[in-house]
């Protein structure tokens, strides 16, 4: 029977040490929020890093984690060492891909050792999921940490359907061409049968890069690549609306709801983001201050609430 295999850098559940024991807590982030409800309802398994270094746990604890995640969460953990976490995740992913794809080229680092770590970890993810792959499965790879994985899967399992979704912008060709390993990244992504982005602008940027860097032709968002066709399209990501509307009636929210309702004739602007330079948080504050300066009649009638989550810290 065919199944869906979701693969992302992080699992929807994070494993942490608590004294001599381990605790399992829900992961936070846009990817987890967007996919968790789907995973719970679908016949799927989810592979990813559980958030704890394999150097912090014993072999016995590893087996216990694997058993717990499989039985309770339908998840497969991919364990990473401290060096892999530092070089692959905090290194290449967050110091090369993240700033460049967000147009912060001056913040981008190009380190061959971190690139090698990125390749090795993508290979490690592939080796971990290989025993779970069947011919008719659908494999859904997510985000910039695993852009080489679609090609690794497709080369080993040509008949398996592979999808990829990028949760961050795909930059214009003028920016993407600055990446030293640009061709390898494109070839890794083109292992997928379907590549998804948030907006059509990102689709257009990707197609432009495949044309100008790899010499590939496309028609109606379909690329002819090697012996197959790759469809590229935009799929704006949503949320589980029913889940969040149901939360509104929870008693834990009542005090906050009542407090907001007591503020008569006041509009509230709500901003929720990670504390990251790409989110434009200082610019939002400056923009709101300028708004009040230019339209003083809105003072005490419009309020800006900022909720800022810690940025990628363990």
Residue ranges and their predicted role:
Residues 1-314:
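Catalytic cores of carbohydrate-active enzymes across secretory and cytosolic contexts
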